[in-house]
From Swiss-Prot:
Entry similarity comment: Belongs to the bacterial ribosomal protein bL32 family.
Disulfide bonds, paired cysteine numbers: none
Ranges in a coiled coil: none
Organism: Tupiella akineta (Green alga)
Record has Chloroplast as a keyword: yes
Family annotation (NCBIfam families): rpmF_bact
Compartmental location: Plastid, Chloroplast
Protein name in UniProt: Large ribosomal subunit protein bL32c
One cellular-component annotation, GO: chloroplast
Major localisation: plastid
Pfam family, any one: Ribosomal_L32p
Acyltransferase is among the record's keywords: no
Gene: rpl32
GO biological process, one term: translation
Length: 56
């Protein structure tokens, strides 16, 4: 016969949520900086090709 499990305490639940949110925040920051670097690199490449086209 199935027996109900004990209820998880609120503090344990909050702790797990906090850990999850910190991991998500860390990944979001990392993704932002990667996108930022890629954007800067793309802008730099566009500027270089624009300069090369105007010199010719």
């Amino acid at each position: 016969m199935a027996v109900p499990k004990k209820r998880t305490s609120k503090s344990k639940t909050n702790l797990r949520k906090t850990v999850w949110k910190k991991k998500a925040l860390k990944q979001a920051i990392q993704a932002y900086f990667i996108a930022s670097r890629a954007s800067k690199k793309l802008n730099l490449e566009k500027a270089i090709t624009k300069d090369l086209n105007t010199e010719s």
